[in-house]
Amino acid sequence: AAGKTAKSILISCGARLAPFDIEELRELMSYDELELDTLGDRKTALFLIMSDTDDTFNFVIAILQSQLFNLLCDKADDEYNGKLPVHVRFLLDEFANIGQIPRFDKLIATIRSREMSASIILQSQSQLKAIYKDAAEIILDNADSTLFLGGRGKNAKDISENLGRETIDSFNTSENRGTQVSHGLNYQKLGKELMTQDEIAVMDG
């Protein structure tokens, strides 16, 4: 049984490390020319571009992002009394395609105090939940602003619920034309969604 377990571990490890059989990837990962530790010192733009049709090497982006978050957090604490001198903003477009960044639910809650912020850009919230499972709710709770550019289904429902409800004044008039004409007026306060799911679905993006 022990032999089978060891063999299973080796097979699993071999599958995970298989991309490093590619010489170009080994060369790319063998030395550092990005100087990630300088990003919080001066204004710098770093673009990470990945294929939108082949996710073979997306894990490299996830590793880099994880290393960058942790490196800058340590740098802020060790060198700048907990806050970087230059704000670092992460624009994480196609965030779901990057792959899972380890401990991202913890990082997103702590980077703000260190003069860092992250914009998470998704096609739908379900993408986030598919990758981060229960931690997706924590990540969403730590996003203080939501920019919605249109959509249907559950996305529109979630946005409608998050917007909440409003109170409206309702007036109903009635008229009775019997032997004597009489008029009635009924007033009540009603609650309704600030924007319904249908209204959100057809709004201009």
Q: Which residues fall in each region the model found?
A:
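P-loop NTPase motor domains
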Residues: 1-116, 131, 141, 201-204
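Acidic, glycine-rich active-site loops and adjacent beta-strand->loop/helix elements
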Residues: 96, 124-126
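Conserved residues at beta->alpha junctions
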Residues: 51, 122, 150
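Structural recognition of the conserved hydrophobic beta-strand(s) that form the central parallel beta-sheet
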Residues: 117-123
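Preference for short coil/turn "hinge" residues that link or interrupt alpha-helices
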Residues: 29-32, 91, 121, 152, ...
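P-loop NTPase motor core of the ASCE superfamily
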Residues: 43-46, 106-109, 127-205
